C-alpha cells in the first residue's frame, strides 16, 4: 500500500510517501519566521502551511518517483496541536482524498512520534513503556502493542522541550534553543550547579521548578521577570546549561525503573524532538537494562513519515479508524492506571 502522510501540527510542514512501512520520501519544511518572535506564532504557522503544502507534495512525489494517482491512502495528523495549523493539514488532506477518491485516516501526532521508532525496529518487544518528549508534550504510555497507547503519566506544567527553550532564552540563545543548549552543555561541568531533579508523587513530572532554579542561578535574589539578566561568563553559561540538562533528564530517568517494573514492560520506546538529545540517550542506556528503541534523527522531529507509517498500520489493522477526520487541539488518552 502506498500511503501519503501529511503533518502540520505546529511549525513544520511535511509530506511523506510510505509503502508497506518503507519510507520512499520524507520532505520537511521548517518555519524560520518564528525565530525573531522567540516562539511559534499560530497564525503565521497556519499561513506558512497553506503556502508550503502544494510545493512540498510535488517534491515528495517526484522524489519517490510516483504520481498522485498511485496513492492508495491519505494519512493526516489531526490531533493534538495548534488548531489552525491542524485545520490546514486536514483540509488539504480532505481535498486530496475527495479528488483522488481515496480513503482518509486521521492520526494522533504524539502516538506517531512513538510509532516512528517501531517503523525502524519491526521486532520491537511489547508490552513497552512509551516516552514521548517534545516541545509540547512529556508523556508516558503503556504500549501493549505498536498501535495502542494508554496514558501512565505526564507533565503537570511545562513540557520538557518548552523548558529547554525557556532556559535557552535565559542564556541568551536564539529560538528554538533546545539543540543549541545541548551543544553549549557539552563543554560545561554538569556538577557545577546543584539543580535538583523535581520529585512529584505518582508517575507525573514537573519542570517549572528547574526553570526557576536556573533563573535564580543567573539573577540571584533579584529574579523577577522584569529584572535584567546580568552579564554571565561563557564558562558559567556552559556550566549552567550542563547542570540544567543533567537535572531535567534525571527528572524523567529517576522514575523509569519503578514504572517499568509496575507495568511489566519489556522495552522502552522513546520519541519526539527531545529524543534526539545525545546526552539523554547515553543516560537511558546507563540506567535501563531493557532494550531501548529510538527513532533516527530525521524521524525525531515533526515529520510526515511517522504519520503515514502509523496511518497505514491502523488502516490495515482496521483499528481506531473514524469515518470523519476532525482537527482537535487536545486529546484525552485512556488511562493505564484505571
From Swiss-Prot:
Any Gene Ontology biological process: tRNA threonylcarbamoyladenosine modification
Pfam families cross-referenced by the UniProt entry: TsaD
> Reaction(s) catalyzed by this protein?
L-threonylcarbamoyladenylate + adenosine(37) in tRNA = N(6)-L-threonylcarbamoyladenosine(37) in tRNA + AMP + H(+)
CDD domains according to UniProt: ASKHA_NBD_TsaD_bac
Cofactor binding summary note: Binds 1 Fe(2+) ion per subunit.
| Keyword Repeat found | no
Which InterPro entries does the record match to this protein? ATPase_NBD, Gcp-like_dom, KAE1/TsaD, Peptidase_M22_CS, TsaD
Query: Where is it localised?
Result: Cytoplasm
Q: What is its main location?
A: cytoplasm
Briefly state the protein's biological role.
Required for the formation of a threonylcarbamoyl group on adenosine at position 37 (t(6)A37) in tRNAs that read codons beginning with adenine. Is involved in the transfer of the threonylcarbamoyl moiety of threonylcarbamoyl-AMP (TC-AMP) to the N6 group of A37, together with TsaE and TsaB. TsaD likely plays a direct catalytic role in this reaction.
The entry assigns this protein to a family as follows: Belongs to the KAE1 / TsaD family.
**Name of the featured protein:** tRNA N6-adenosine threonylcarbamoyltransferase
Organism classification: Bacteria, Pseudomonadati, Chlamydiota, Chlamydiia, Chlamydiales
Q: Which gene encodes it?
A: tsaD
Amino acid at each position: 500500500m502506498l500511503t501519503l502522510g501529511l503533518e502540520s501540527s505546529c511549525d513544520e510542514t511535511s509530506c511523506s510517501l510510505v509503502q508497506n512501512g518503507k519510507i520512499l520520501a520524507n520532505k520537511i519544511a521548517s518555519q524560520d519566521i518564528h525565530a525573531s518572535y522567540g516562539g511559534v506564532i499560530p497564525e503565521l504557522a497556519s499561513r506558512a502551511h497553506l503556502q508550503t503544502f502544494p510545493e512540498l507534495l510535488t517534491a515528495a512525489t517526484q522524489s519517490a518517483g510516483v504520481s498522485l494517482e498511485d496513492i492508495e491512502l491519505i494519512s493526516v495528523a489531526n490531533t493534538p496541536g495548534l488548531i489552525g495549523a491542524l485545520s490546514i493539514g486536514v483540509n488539504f488532506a480532505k481535498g486530496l482524498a475527495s479528488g483522488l477518491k481515496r480513503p482518509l485516516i486521521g492520526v494522533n501526532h504524539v502516538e506517531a512520534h512513538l510509532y516512528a521508532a517501531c517503523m525502524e525496529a519491526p521486532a520491537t518487544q511489547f508490552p513497552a513503556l512509551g516516552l514521548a518528549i517534545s516541545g509540547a508534550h512529556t508523556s508516558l504510555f503503556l504500549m501493549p502493542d505498536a498501535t495502542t497507547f494508554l496514558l501512565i503519566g505526564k507533565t503537570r506544567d511545562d513540557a520538557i522541550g518548552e523548558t529547554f527553550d525557556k532556559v535557552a532564552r535565559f542564556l541568551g540563545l536564539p529560538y528554538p534553543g533546545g539543540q543549541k543548549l545541548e551543544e553549549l552543555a557539552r563543554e560545561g561541568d554538569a556538577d557545577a550547579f546543584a539543580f535538583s531533579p523535581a520529585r512529584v508523587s505518582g508517575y507525573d513530572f514537573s519542570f517549572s521548578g528547574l526553570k526557576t532554579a536556573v533563573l535564580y542561578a543567573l539573577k540571584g535574589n533579584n529574579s523577577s521577570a522584569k529584572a535584567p539578566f546580568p552579564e554571565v561568563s561563557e564558562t558559567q553559561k556552559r556550566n549552567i546549561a550542563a547542570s540544567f540538562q543533567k537535572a531535567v533528564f534525571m527528572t524523567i530517568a529517576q522514575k523509569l525503573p519503578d514504572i517499568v517494573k509496575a507495568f511489566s514492560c519489556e522495552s522502552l520506546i522513546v520519541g519526539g524532538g527531545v529524543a534526539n538529545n545525545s546526552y539523554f540517550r547515553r543516560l537511558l542506556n546507563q540506567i535501563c537494562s531493557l532494550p531501548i528503541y529510538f527513532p533516527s534523527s530525521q524521524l525525531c522531529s515533526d515529520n510526515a513519515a511517522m504519520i503515514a507509517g502509523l496511518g497505514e498500520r491502523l488502516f490495515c489493522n482496521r483499528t481506531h479508524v473514524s469515518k470523519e477526520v476532525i482537527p482537535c487541539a487536545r486529546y484525552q488518552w485512556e488511562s493505564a492506571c484505571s
